[in-house]
Amino acid sequence: MTKSDLLFDKFNDKHGKFLVFFGTFVDTPKLGELRIREKTSVGVLNGIIRFVNRNSLDPVKDCLDHDSSLSPEDVTVVDIIGKDKTRNNSFYFPGFVDTHNHVSQYPNVGVFGNSTLLDWLEKYTFPIEAALANENIAREVYNKVISKTLSHGTTTVAYYNTIDLKSTKLLAQLSSLLGQRVLVGKVCMDTNGPEYYIEDTKTSFESTVKVVKYIRETICDPLVNPIVTPRFAPSCSRELMQQLSKLVKDENIHVQTHLSENKEEIQWVQDLFPECESYTDVYDKYGLLTEKTVLAHCIHLTDAEARVIKQRRCGISHCPISNSSLTSGECRVRWLLDQGIKVGLGTDVSAGHSCSILTTGRQAFAVSRHLAMRETDHAKLSVSECLFLATMGGAQVLRMDETLGTFDVGKQFDAQMIDTNAPGSNVDMFHWQLKEKDQMQEQEQEQGQDPYKNPPLLTNEDIIAKWFFNGDDRNTTKVWVAGQQVYQI
């Protein structure tokens, strides 16, 4: 049994067949809405949420009321409140969704010098991706990235791998073994690559078909699905894009690629594809824009391009860390949302220097503030909006919002347990800031007489904000994917 086998087996609960999670549940069902449900029980069977009871007095009874054929022995309760049922500042939050992660580039995290996109690809990116044709190197990197993203609460990831067929199959294997929900893509590039890292058109297409078949027929795991991955327009011939488009439509597969990341890149695309009206039009003309297409970056879109993306119902992966690191620009997220375009968050490792979607969300918050400084306050994103992008927004981009993103009946239970008081936590709160509602009311009455007598108390929204700005993987104590525990601190 491998180390990965042990890791996966260790955390899978084999007690009662019906799981009931009890405590405070926080999610964002709509953009701008932060839903907080205290003392709530959520029943999960076979990975699916079967009931949600607010103000629960007895989680086991809730389960037996839901299904009278059950006995107490059939029920396992995960309780983060404790016997005294007092406020402890732990809560369940939906698993994060990373819509853009170059898993193969992880060894280069933090290494980009003073480069911008195109020279960064040549100097740093292509060499490290080529190195992962070595299975031993690839296995070490993939195990690290999957484990690390899970430890940061990321339950769903769209992975870009490399042009190598064997290592892409390995990535799918390890993702299934470790229990992460993933889209796995073999990068396609048959033009404008270095001699040591490029494919011919036939090999690129046929290896993609093999990956799709391998994932669907050999891995055969509902958590692991293929995604067609033309790197970006400059690295793909017209013939290759047309072949990939037919595959996507025939097999109903996701697509992921890059769009409008860098001004020099945009000019290059215009030079390479003079028959197309814009960068977006290249993908549209060659059939790669579908409702299951994920477009990373989209910083410098024109109004016309945004209209096409909306019409084709594509989703956009906002990658604020890498956009800043490579000085690519600031994506106008509010502008996209106002047009009804789906937006999620992407770590974009390795130009993005963190595997954490929470860190990425903080950067999205900051970038929106910088945009507002030269535009209007309307460009600002709130904490709840950034958390929406990190969960439900990402699920929408990946066309998984009917099954992921919130704690609602019928959805998969992809979740993380957050403990703001975890050992070493960077989220500092003082006991006198934290009291029950009746104590808060008493204090408010006292403050009415003397506003300086007692310090202000933290609301639930305040606690979520402190976690958003100061939290990290130390606060993510457990993680579940489809009801199976896949990580424990």
From Swiss-Prot:
* Extra remark beyond the main annotation: Present with 279 molecules/cell in log phase SD medium.
Q: Where in the cell is it found?
A: Cytoplasm
Could you tell me what this protein is called?
Answer: Probable guanine deaminase
Disulfide bond residue pairs: none
Catalytic activity of the protein: guanine + H2O + H(+) = xanthine + NH4(+)
A Pfam family that the UniProt record links to this protein: Amidohydro_1
Q: What does the similarity note say?
A: Belongs to the metallo-dependent hydrolases superfamily. ATZ/TRZ family.
Q: Does the keyword Magnesium apply?
A: no
Q: Where does Zn(2+) bind?
A: H100, H102, H258, D348
Describe the task this protein carries out.
Catalyzes the hydrolytic deamination of guanine, producing xanthine and ammonia.
PANTHER family, per the entry: GUANINE DEAMINASE
Pathway in which this enzyme or protein is active: Purine metabolism; guanine degradation; xanthine from guanine: step 1/1
What cofactor does this chain's UniProt record say it requires? Zn(2+)
**GO MF entry, a single one:** guanine deaminase activity
Q: Does the keyword GTP-binding apply?
A: no
Q: What class of enzyme is it?
A: hydrolase
Cellular component terms (Gene Ontology) = cytoplasm; cytosol
What's noted on cofactor binding? Binds 1 zinc ion per subunit.
One GO BP: guanine catabolic process
Positions with a binding annotation for substrate: H102, V103, S104, Q105, R231, F232, H258, L259, S260, E261, D348
Extract the SUPFAM superfamilies matched here: Metallo-dependent hydrolases
- Keyword field: Cytoplasm, Hydrolase, Metal-binding, Zinc
